């Protein structure tokens, strides 16, 4: 009680001291001037990146320009649980997850020179899946988030616009969303995890950019998969499952990693089904994303990946799978090294840094990037992506049947 009164007296003494100072006219003027000087920077701070807006990273600018109803640039990570999903608990889990990923609380805006992300203060909602997966997320319809959370039966779906994040960022979000949902289902205490990645660092491409002699992307047209086109509003999804232990056994037999083995098998399958198996008129090529965080210091949850082209050249077709495995292994060992990836970063960022490119209005950039993108897509037959191990913490694993990726 006495201590409380002493504190109140000290506060009153401070007020009296301030009041005494205000009786000096000269000091009032100086204090007002100082206050004005201090207030100016505060107004500027509101426009600092990460507070109300931030630039798109180097890769996101391309996705924002080329995406639409016919090319959504949306990919999906799903968690298949052992029990039917409760929509109300999933909504609570989403509200609990979003504050852990501050760079996801945004909406896409269009500026005069570039697209940018603006803070979105609304709460996202969950929805029951009723249409095709990976639909375009139109940023101009309301204040939409650049991601979608849906459910169907025992499955939780997290679909995200590739301009917001890459496979690692989406994997982190989907895992935490699943964990928070299962915490609510099982009435477990919330497990707070230390942040492994910084949510507000916006572009590690620029941070690791060095002006280097760089290689241009391969633009020679590759073999295209033939088949019957589905109607615009339909999509075919094929899913296969294999035991990891059995897959590792096959990889050990030929002495390669899982990624090398599956990439080689995919190339071999395309050659067997799309050619006569003897001669290739065009190369068969895979577009393979590479996580740059494995080679450069990075804490970003924005995009930070590069793509490499793994192919079998035009001409004589391989006679056995072992030939393709050996070729794929050599190509990946040569291309997926820090020096080559630095050249890729240099090429991508150097175009953005040119003053005359920065000065071009967005609608002109938009058309140019669409043309460049369409030209570059002809250089690969298919995209093959391995985003790594998908998991939840140990005490929740018995509630999860599997994880799925759909690009």
Regions inferred by a protein language model and the residue ranges of each:
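Short acidic-rich active-site patches of cyclic nucleotide enzymes
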Residues: 76, 154-155
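Acyl activation and transfer enzymes in specialized metabolism, enriched
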Residues: 82-100, 159-175, 239-276
């Amino acid at each position: 009680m006495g201590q409380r009164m002493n504190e109140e007296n000290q506060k009153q003494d401070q007020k009296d001291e301030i009041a005494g100072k205000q009786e000096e006219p000269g000091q009032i003027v100086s204090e007002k001037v100082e206050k004005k000087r201090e207030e100016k920077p505060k107004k500027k701070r509101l426009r600092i990146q990460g507070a109300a807006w931030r630039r798109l990273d180097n890769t996101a600018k391309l996705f924002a320009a080329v995406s639409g109803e016919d090319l959504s640039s949306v990919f999906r990570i799903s968690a298949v649980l052992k029990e039917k999903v409760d929509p109300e608990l999933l909504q609570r889990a989403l509200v609990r997850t979003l504050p852990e990923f501050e760079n996801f609380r945004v909406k896409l805006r269009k500026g005069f020179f570039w697209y940018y992300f603006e803070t979105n203060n609304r709460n996202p909602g969950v929805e029951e899946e009723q249409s095709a997966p990976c639909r375009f997320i139109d940023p101009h319809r309301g204040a939409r988030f650049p991601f979608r959370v849906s459910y169907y039966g025992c499955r939780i779906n997290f679909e995200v616009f590739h301009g917001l994040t890459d496979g690692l960022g989406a994997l982190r979000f989907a895992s935490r969303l699943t964990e928070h949902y299962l915490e609510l289902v099982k009435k477990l205490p919330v497990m707070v995890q230390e942040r492994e990645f910084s949510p507000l660092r916006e572009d590690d491409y620029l941070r690791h950019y060095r002006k280097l002699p760089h290689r241009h992307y391969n633009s020679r047209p590759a073999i295209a998969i033939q088949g019957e086109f589905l109607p615009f509003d339909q999509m075919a999804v094929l899913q296969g499952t294999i035991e990891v232990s059995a897959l590792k056994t096959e990889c050990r037999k030929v002495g390669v990693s899982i990624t090398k083995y599956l990439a080689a098998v995919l190339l071999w399958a395309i050659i067997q089904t799309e050619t006569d198996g003897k001669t290739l008129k065009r190369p068969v090529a895979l577009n393979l994303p590479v996580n740059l965080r494995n080679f450069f210091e990075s804490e970003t949850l924005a995009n930070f990946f590069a793509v490499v082209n793994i192919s079998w050249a035009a001409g004589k077709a391989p006679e056995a799978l072992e030939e393709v495995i050996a070729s794929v292994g050599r190509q990946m060992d040569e291309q997926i090294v820090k020096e080559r990836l630095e050249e890729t970063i240099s090429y991508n960022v150097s175009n953005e840094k040119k003053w005359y490119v920065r000065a071009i209005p967005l609608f002109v950039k938009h058309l140019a990037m669409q043309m460049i993108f369409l030209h570059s897509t002809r250089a690969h037959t298919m995209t093959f992506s391995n985003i790594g191990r998908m998991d939840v913490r140990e005490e929740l694993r018995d509630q999860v049947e599997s994880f799925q990726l759909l690009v």
